[in-house]
Each structure stands twice: as C-alpha cells, then as structure tokens.
C-alpha cells in the first residue's frame, strides 16, 4: 500500500505508478489546496478507470484506489493508527 499526500501536481504520478504495479493507493488530499486536489482527483480517477481500479472515499478528502475489491482490514487499521482515516 502506498500513501500519497500530494503537495504538487507532479506528485500524482505516484498514484499511477503504484496502481500499475498492483499496489493499493491511499490518496490523502486533506492538506492539499482545493484547486490542486480537484486536478489530482481528476487525474487519479482517470488512471483508475483506465486500469479498472476501484475508488472508495475512506475519509474526509481521503480516497483508496485499489485494483482489488477494497482495502484489507490490516490496511485500514494502519491508516487509522496514522490518523489518515
């Protein structure tokens, strides 16, 4: 699982790279300015669509992108302990 908390548009590339490798991605946009967050979401949703990945909102401005059904309970637990969700 890769957690991406983008500070710039170029950081969105980490989403596509991780998904192509089959890793789950948690996209944490909580600290990302709204205009940038929208651009990154548009890009990430496009990547998810192209790769037949699932997108789930797991928290306030936090999204899970997976090429499997959903995050495992262990992954969710880790995100809770990190204060992401």
Residue spans for each PLM region:
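Positively charged, small/polar-rich N-terminal and surface patches that mediate targeting and assembly
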Residues: 1-25, 30, 41-85
